[in-house]
Amino acid sequence: MIFSLLLFISHILSQDWQSFHYQDQKRFEAFQINSLNIDERAKTFNPINNNRNNLSHEVIGYLPYWEYDEYPDLNYNLLTQINFFSAELSDYGDIINNHNWENLYFIEFAQSQGVKVKLCATLFGQESLTTLLSNYFNRQNAINNLLDLVVNAGADGIDIDFELVPASQRENLVLFMQELSFAFHNELDDPIITMATPAIDWSNAWDYESLAAITDGLFIMGYNYFYSGSSNAGPVAPLGGYFYDIEYTVNDYLDKTNNQTDKLVLGLPYYGYDWPVVNDLINSETTGYGTART
């Protein structure tokens, strides 16, 4: 059974490809959460006794820090977990910015609605990830810092979003997740540990089978098959009809995880791109970068 996921709110193999998450993180890097008024409003809400019997799957959402003011109005009846995006790591495992995570009422609020809360930790880029993953002390520094953030906030777990992992760090990534899992399970009762993983493993950097066994779930980023800089317009998450599409990705994960279906989380997008194009034909050539629309 493939878990479904609600995502916040080719093609891929190109020199100017950038992660959608990285683009948003850079776009909003100067954004400051003004939580006081939002949290005070949320405290006036009465907790809802959610009935999870109607949910046939685990349903996970992401709350980006730049959309923090939306959290009191989310429909928590449709969620079982929510990840706060994000705590940004340095190459050496320090926390660059956690966006006031430990002081956010959102954590207590979501938990009062019966929803588990995880912190999403991010680091993007081959050089940065090589520096972090190849060094024991950097790995331990990151793990200790993330564990402190989760414990001090009373959250339920961690979600690791490392993107553009180089092939040279395949084994070190598994080692990092083993070390992280050990530390979290040693400190917390039944922590939830998940990872964001790519739609296509272009460089053979991901040991899906080992990572699925270590974690509670691999969140398959099933989007950005066509991206902002694509030479042709197309769907960001085509179900089928292309060589690389959702069907290909799911089958690839099933094959490489030895059918660990209880560990696969399919991430689906709530966005698309609006490109300037040559004509109105399907998959027309683009004449510039696309703008994300939700």
Which stretches of residues belong to each language-model region?
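Structural recognition of alpha->loop->beta junctions
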Residues: 75-85, 135-163, 207-225
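Substrate-binding surface in catalytic domains of secreted glycosidases
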Residues: 91-101, 144, 165-294
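Extracellular/periplasmic catalytic domains that process cell-envelope and extracellular macromolecules
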Residues: 52-55, 73-78, 110-113, 151-153, ...
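Glycan-recognition patch characteristic of GH18 chitinases/ENGases
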Residues: 15-148
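Short secondary-structure transition/capping segments
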Residues: 129-133, 151, 171-172, 205-207
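Hydrophobic h-region of N-terminal signal peptides that target proteins for export
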Residues: 4-14
